[in-house]
Amino acid sequence: MNYRRLGRTGFEVSEIGYGAWGIGGAQWQGGTDEESMRAVHRAIELGLNFIDTALAYGDGHSERLVGKIVREAGRRIYVATKVPPKNQLWPARRGIGIDQVFPYDYVIESTETSLKNLGMETVDLQQLHVWNPEWIGRDEWKRALEDLKKSGKARFVGVSINDHQPDSALELIRTGLIDTVQVIYNVFDQSPERNLFPLTEQFNIGVIARVPLDEGALTGAITEETKFDERDFRDYYFRGDHKKQVVEHVNALRRDLGNVDGSLPEIALRFCLSEPAVSTVIPGMRRVRHAESNIATAEKGPLDEKTMAVLRRHAWEKNFYGEP
């Protein structure tokens, strides 16, 4: 496993981290706690040392599993979690004030609940789970994040940027008040490269790249006949003609890649890791074989320029999550 610095936190984190939304259950069906825990422990054996969870993942279930895993790990594991929006709206909506989303007392209380779930006195990284640039001039969130650090409840703080809106955090980064950003970055959504990544490098901000496989679209396993449990988030994500669109784009991508070595998910992960601004990439890995293959992929290093040029042509502007 290779390691990169998570910006000014100074944490040396594994290039492949663990995205723990799936192990919360609820919106991700088809797995078990036992299977998920085996996968995380295997990833840790192979060098993974960064796990990203959230209070909203299974109403704390993901955090409780992560806490148990960390206690059993026998080595230093960096843990990041998130404060959910109080109004339960993802992504953050324009025109809704921060007093309805992240009031001061709520941020503190949510963090304390997360710490209880995790079985920790301090979390390495606490993040706001959504962000709205209209809040930049308000004091509540600034005071809450500063007090989390002063009180020792969180070592560092960051923000998870709204889906497909990387530029919404540019002014936030310039305030100097956050240490990390989490952003969607993959072959289809390359938009953070334009403005966000240059700024994170300038301000020494850690970058957590989420959704590297586009919720499964870039695994190449989605067909027009693919079915998901109606309780599964992916049933919504791949609704309507979305599966048809994915199949068309993935087929075009495969044609262009030709004989490039590696499977589609391997190439997709290496695409993310070829960006020097990225500190860690956090795929979900609920099965041991996925943990092993993803970590083995990281060992192969960045893609060559010819392959990157091919992938650059496949940026795709879409929003399957729904309009904010």
What does each model-found stretch correspond to?
Residues 1-77:
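N-terminal binding-site loop/beta-alpha segment at the start of enzyme catalytic domains
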Residues 76-88:
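A short, structured active-site edge motif that brings together acidic residues
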Residues 59, 130-324:
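Beta/alpha (TIM)-barrel catalytic core signal, keyed to glycine-rich beta->alpha loops juxtaposed to Asp/Glu
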Residues 6, 18, 36, 51, ...:
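Conserved, mostly hydrophobic/aromatic
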Residues 30-43, 100-118, 163-171:
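Short, acidic/polar
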Residues 8-10, 67-78, 115-119, 149, ...:
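Acidic (Asp/Glu)-rich catalytic clusters
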Residues 115-134:
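Active-site groove signature of glycoside hydrolases
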